[in-house]
Amino acid sequence: YWPEYSCNGKEDTKVSDLLCHRAAMFGFKEGIPLGSFQDWNKFIQQLQLQTPYRKPGISQGYHALTFGWLVGELIRRVDGRSVGQYFKEEIAEPLNIDFHIGLDEIDLIRCADMLMIERDSMQLPGQFLRYVPSFLLPQRLKNFKTALLSGDFLEAFQEREEEDANYVNSLDWRKAEIPSANGHGTAKSLARLYGILSNGCARDEISIMSEASLQYAITPHSSGPDSVLFGAPIKFGLGYELAQGISTVGNISPTLNNKMFGHAG
């Protein structure tokens, strides 16, 4: 699908690796490209030439920002349309879902501003674990320490230097198509979308996908530990985050199967 991506150690990357956060491309090694967020090709060119952080397919690391460009470019290569255009024409408009990947001028006035946390106020949890010998830690905390020392979190959630933390309120950001970070919509529209997916994947004779495709997509394809999210045993299907099993009475009752899917963020 994407011949230019097949270089510099990424030659054996599978589509499933991109969809379940195992492509080892969770950050921009040279920093997030400067200039307009609407310049899709600038971000794609940097990613397709980059070497992965480690061998693709071996470990899980949440692709917080890069996921949207990587999977979005696959969609563009296969279909010819951008991910925002595809979503609008194939899903949002036919099913009356007020959700957008890249806002049109007419919708800007409806958009609420966001108040972002300054990076200096974001203290990484568990810094003290750096100084605790690993053999003294239970496995979950060992995974946490390994992820903390790797620095993967800072790579995946990096920001452009000297950028105002409230850049997400800029016209450039709102008009850009950044599928992993700047979808704009209403709570009702998200409820409608997931209501359709959880009830046969179709409404008014319009189908988003087959039920078989959805069941395949929400089958666990990766389950951590996640090197970006501090070693957490997060499960991913193909594009969806999957819920963990739940216990009704603390840890003493049997674990129940939890079929929720979507994203916790």
Label every PLM stretch briefly.
Residues 21-22, 50, 196-200, 220:
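Generic structural signal for alpha-helix termini and adjacent loop/cap motifs
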Residues 118-187, 216-265:
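Active-site Gly/Thr loop motif
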Residues 18, 46-47, 217, 240:
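A generic structural signal for nonpolar/aromatic side chains embedded in well-ordered alpha-helices
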Residues 5-10, 229-231:
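Acidic pyrophosphate-coordinating catalytic loop
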Residues 3, 10-13, 20-112, 167, ...:
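Catalytic-site signature segments of enzymes, centered on catalytic residues
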Residues 76, 194-205:
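Non-catalytic, well-ordered alpha-helical segments in soluble enzyme domains
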Residues 186-189, 195:
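Glycine-rich, aromatic-lined ligand/substrate-binding cores of catalytic
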Residues 202-215, 229-231:
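Short acidic alpha-helical/loop segments enriched in Asp/Glu that coordinate divalent cations
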